[in-house]
Amino acid sequence: MSQTVSGRDKYVDWLRALSLIVVVVWHWAFTILQWTPQGPSATSPLGFTSGLWILTWLFQVLPLFFYVGGHVHLMSWQRACERGVGIGAFVWRRIRALAAPALVLSGVWIGIGAAVTWAFDVAWMWRVVVLVLSPLWFLGVYLVLIALLPIALWMHRRFDVLALIWLGGAALVVDVLRFRYGFEWAGWLNMIIVWGLAHQSGFFYRRIVALPRRYDVGLLWTGLFALIGLVYSGIYPGSMVGVPGEKLSNMAPPTFVIVALLVFQIGLVEVLRPSMERLLERPRWKRVNDTINRFALPLFLFHTTGMAIALGLTWWLFGSIGGRIPPDLTWWLERPIAIVGPLLCTLPVIYLFGRPRKAA
């Protein structure tokens, strides 16, 4: 296991930061914003490009983020125990560190929304605020899981791997209630059950790392075959992200398919581990890893703010911000610009209001 001098697992740091950056780049590159009489409306090329949904099996990385987060929380708690820190203080410190910047950002945008609506009498400004803040939903789930950490740790000590089996079974039961018996409200229980399962799986990270390589390959193929079977059962959509216009999403709320995706991604990152650990030992890659870990969370928090600024400048300079539907060749060729533009607008926001931080 590749570690820094301080004992950190560099591959864990890489996975956690990379998962946030993948989310950011996906939002920048694959959001098609249309202006309607009611205000801005976002859609995606997934609804117009046949077969593109298969990419979401690799780039929907939230299961991996929660998995790595579970491992980090367990390791951090063990270090806190050695210092004599109580579980209440530990949980509160982590909630405060994550919630404070998110709440400040939300407050600023709500204030901007109220001011613009009052000054210019434009109701659409609230749609802008919702679009900018909507990616923060998963931080809310993450905060709930941190608050539930005492229960999760107790389950891990008391029941070990049975906790994962029970959570997986509960996620499947929720889908049965939802799709077989029509209890749509039950699906929202999976916001905690499915993401809680991913987080709980992270407690087994070191055991998974210690397994022989054939088990890594087994996890990868088990997850992949489960994904194929579930998607082609006709019950679940193929995309691992929401697609505008489809009546069912695997993400809102999450379905049992996300459990299969989690298994697939755990297997994949373990299969890639030897190569990536060798790469992360190189001085240049060490610097890259350190840099993205310092900036990943601020970049995630402010990336939609930067995108809003970039779109505002585009409207000011060119008089239009609407993306083409369906996306054509020109739209695809513009994707590098769609990434670089918001990035250049986000970096000053991070410099002014964000605080690059090291992963805890």
Please annotate each region the language model reported:
Residues 2-360:
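Alpha-helical transmembrane segments and their immediate juxtamembrane cytosolic regions
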